[in-house]
């Protein structure tokens, strides 16, 4: 009885020690990335309600070299406007779109972000990317964002910029 129990326990332990399968080193199979990257390059606009009763507008410019600048305009429920800008790197991996914020732009000055802050690295599942529409979901908080592609000269509509 003890011998049978020891054999069974050994088999269970060995089953958990199996080696992983081989990995593919060639990146040639990344066709999805090659199709999506050019679709994201350009300027995108979104306007979303906030849980506090206001809304946030965003103009994100994704460059072909993998850098981005995004301008935010937050309008609270009283109508107070606050503008900000951040810059960093963006990319795709499969159906994941990601950004890494490297700092903020204040006037014409770049303020670098402290290195290694997890809050400045964001990953999103791409839900839709076609016909000038980009919908994506935050992996972390599950918020869904929707943006439309706009002309390179596009600016925030109708509200004068806040005084910084």
Language-model region placement:
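Sec-dependent N-terminal signal peptides
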Residues: 4-14
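Lipid interaction determinants
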Residues: 17-85, 91, 98-164
């Amino acid at each position: 009885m003890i011998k049978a129990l020891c054999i069974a326990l050994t088999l269970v332990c060995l089953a958990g020690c199996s080696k992983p399968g081989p990995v593919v080193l060639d990146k040639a199979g990344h066709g999805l990335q090659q199709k999506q990257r050019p679709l994201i390059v350009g300027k995108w606009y979104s306007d979303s309600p906030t849980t506090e009763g206001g809304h946030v507008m965003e103009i994100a410019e994704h460059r072909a070299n993998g850098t981005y600048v995004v301008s935010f305009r937050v309008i609270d429920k009283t109508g107070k406007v606050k503008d900000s800008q951040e810059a960093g790197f963006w990319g795709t991996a499969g159906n994941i779109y990601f950004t890494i914020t490297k700092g903020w732009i204040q006037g014409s000055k770049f303020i670098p972000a402290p290195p290694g802050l997890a809050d400045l690295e964001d990953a999103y599942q791409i839900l839709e990317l076609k016909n000038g529409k980009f919908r994506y979901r935050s992996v972390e908080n599950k918020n869904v964002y929707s943006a439309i592609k706009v002309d390179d000269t596009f600016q925030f509509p109708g509200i004068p910029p806040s005084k910084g």
